[in-house]
């Protein structure tokens, strides 16, 4: 698994990723999220086309609040499927 800094580049393919996030409590943590190359196609109510058309971003879903953009990402890597037993 190779971590890539968001300063170097962002994903180019829609899909699931692991990200390292700078937390508000001065700690970094890892979270499983998704990436899309166009947030407006994901949910135009939350991500209106006027502001988000063609804009990529990491996002997640919350059962109470719905889709939301994941901020403060410092690094990412592709989430690979389990190849175990």
Where do the PLM segments sit?
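Secondary-structure transition motif
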Residues: 2-85
């Amino acid at each position: 698994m190779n971590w890539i800094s968001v300063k170097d580049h962002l994903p180019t393919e829609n899909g699931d990723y692991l990200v390292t996030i700078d937390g508000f409590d001065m700690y970094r943590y890892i979270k499983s999220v998704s990436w899309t190359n166009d947030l407006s196609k994901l949910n135009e109510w939350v991500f209106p086309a006027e502001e988000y058309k063609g804009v990529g971003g990491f996002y997640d879903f919350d059962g109470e609040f719905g889709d939301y953009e994941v901020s403060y990402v410092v690094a990412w890597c592709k989430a690979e499927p389990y190849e175990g037993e």
